[in-house]
Design a protein with these regions (language model features):
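Oxyanion/phosphate-interacting regions
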Residues: 1-13, 17, 183-192, 199, ...
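N-terminal subdomain of lithium-sensitive/metallo-dependent phosphomonoesterases centered on the IMPase/IPPase/PAP
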Residues: 1-89, 184, 242, 248-250, ...
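Residue-level signal for inorganic ion chemistry
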Residues: 20, 46, 57, 92, ...
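Short, surface-exposed acidic/glycine-rich loop or hinge patches that mediate macromolecular interfaces
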Residues: 47, 69, 176-177, 204, ...
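Short glycine/proline-enriched turns and hinge-like loops at secondary-structure junctions
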Residues: 76-78, 96-100, 130, 257
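Glycine-rich active-site/cofactor-binding loop and its immediate structural neighborhood
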Residues: 80-119
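Acidic beta-strand-loop-alpha-helix segment within the catalytic core
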Residues: 107-207, 256-278
Length: 278
């Protein structure tokens, strides 16, 4: 893929992050919370971030599949060899709680595989970006690209994974969706590891923690959609990790007829499959 596309995605994520923070930091804002058809929350920040991302990415040759955009039927989408998959504000519940654990997720998917990913944490001003050719990186303290080239961004960033190997076996799990099946998995891991630590986090940050090497595994045995995982999946792949369907050797696939993900586990590629069992 052309390098310009990842710069497009970075610009879109940073600009959307600026929109989100302008609302998040406004003490008078009540976030104008609505309920979507699946009863999940929707705020004005979700809508504004979507509009910003769509405007920037419209200059690329690829169609856009966004959580907050119009979802075309599969009879149309299946023709898309390459597409953007976007969650303008991943972790709306965390945004509403004002705990800072929300992200902007932008992925480029080619033939059902996420080949490029950008995740931005507006509160922490942390940017994760990756593609198959350059690898995965984390850049801290960024709010705008300011005409920096991709090489300049990479030179200022940390190559992932940054932290490999620690005394404890670290599991990262959802702060808002810790299912009974996940709790069973955690107990099972205690049979294989003498010292297990559980980290709770929101949004796609969990995948990033595995990509960084700060966590060993992220089990997700609860519903997610393709836009929740595509960007993180691209970053994980570029960092030597994989997002496997739970209980299988197969990674998640994208632009499916049903946009709901199966349960999955994020872990290094070399890990034995027994850890993917439920």
């Amino acid at each position: 893929m052309e390098r310009q596309y990842i710069l497009n995605a970075i610009d879109a994520a940073l600009c959307a992050g600026k929109d989100i923070i302008s609302i998040y930091d406004d003490p008078a804002s009540d976030f104008e919370i609505e309920k979507k058809a699946d009863n999940s929350p929707l705020t004005i920040a979700d809508r504004k971030a979507h509009e910003t991302i769509a405007k920037i990415l419209q200059d690329t040759p690829f169609p856009l599949l966004s959580e907050e955009g119009k979802h075309l039927p599969f009879v149309e989408r299946h023709k898309w060899e390459t597409l953007w998959i976007v969650d303008p504000l991943d972790g709306t519940k965390e945004f509403i709680k004002r705990n800072g654990e929300f992200t902007v997720n932008i992925a480029l998917v080619h033939n059902s595989v996420p080949v490029m990913g950008v995740i931005y944490l507006p509160v922490k001003r942390e940017l994760y970006f990756a593609d198959e050719e350059i690898g995965a990186y984390k850049l801290s303290g960024i709010t705008t690209r300011a005409e920096a080239t991709l090489d300049e961004l990479m030179a200022s960033a940390v190559r992932l994974p940054d932290k490999v190997g620690h005394d404890k076996f670290v599991i990262v799990a959802s702060r808002s969706h810790l299912s009974p099946e996940t709790e069973v998995y955690i107990e099972e891991m205690k049979r294989y590891h003498s010292d297990v630590e559980l980290i709770s986090s929101g949004s796609s940050i969990k995948i990033c923690l595995v990509a960084e090497g700060k966590a060993d595994v992220y089990p997700r045995f609860a519903p997610t959609m393709e836009w929740d995982t595509a960007a993180g999946h691209a970053i994980a792949r570029a960092a030597g990790m994989e997002v496997y369907q739970a209980g299988k050797e197969e990674p998640l696939r994208y632009n499916k007829e049903d946009l709901l993900n199966p349960w999955f586990i994020v872990e290094p590629r070399h890990v034995k499959t027994k850890k993917r069992s439920l």
